[in-house]
UniProtKB/Swiss-Prot annotation:
GO terms for cellular component: cytoplasm. GO terms for molecular function: ATP binding; metal ion binding; protein folding chaperone; protein-folding chaperone binding; unfolded protein binding. Its main location: cytoplasm. PANTHER family: 10 KDA HEAT SHOCK PROTEIN, CO-CHAPERONIN GROES. The gene is groES. Belongs to the GroES chaperonin family. Pfam families: Cpn10 (PF00166). This is Co-chaperonin GroES. GO terms for biological process: chaperone cofactor-dependent protein refolding. InterPro entries: Chaperonin_GroES, Chaperonin_GroES_sf, Chaprnonin_Cpn10_CS, GroES-like_sf. Together with the chaperonin GroEL, plays an essential role in assisting protein folding. The GroEL-GroES system forms a nano-cage that allows encapsulation of the non-native substrate proteins and provides a physical environment optimized to promote and accelerate protein folding. GroES binds to the apical surface of the GroEL ring, thereby capping the opening of the GroEL channel. Keywords: Chaperone, Cytoplasm. The keyword Cytoplasm applies.
Length: 94
């Protein structure tokens, strides 16, 4: 499994099928980049200059909304993930 370092988080992107109002399914080339995912792994947290570690706000299993162009896409074990900083998460869906 991927284990992120520092304040990084591994997200499994949730892709929704996009349809127009008339029911036409859009091809991948016409879809917007997804912004929702599920947290699958979290790093230990950010370390300040004085050595103090800042705790994480996100936990494994959280559904989150993140910045549109945030993170780095990686493929691991046949699945695609996004590794991003915790500050790129905009909201947690509860």
């Amino acid at each position: 499994m991927l284990k992120p370092l520092g304040d990084r988080i591994v997200i499994e992107v949730v892709e929704t099928e996009e349809k127009t109002a008339s029911g036409i399914v859009l091809p991948d080339t016409a879809k917007e980049k997804p912004q929702e995912g599920r947290v699958v792994a979290v790093g230990a947290g950010r370390v300040l200059d004085n050595g103090q570690r800042i705790g994480r706000k996100s936990k494994v299993g959280d559904r989150v909304i993140f910045s549109k162009y945030a993170g780095t896409e990686v493929k691991y074990d046949g699945k695609e993930y996004l590794i991003l900083r915790e500050s790129d998460i905009l909201a947690v869906i509860r």
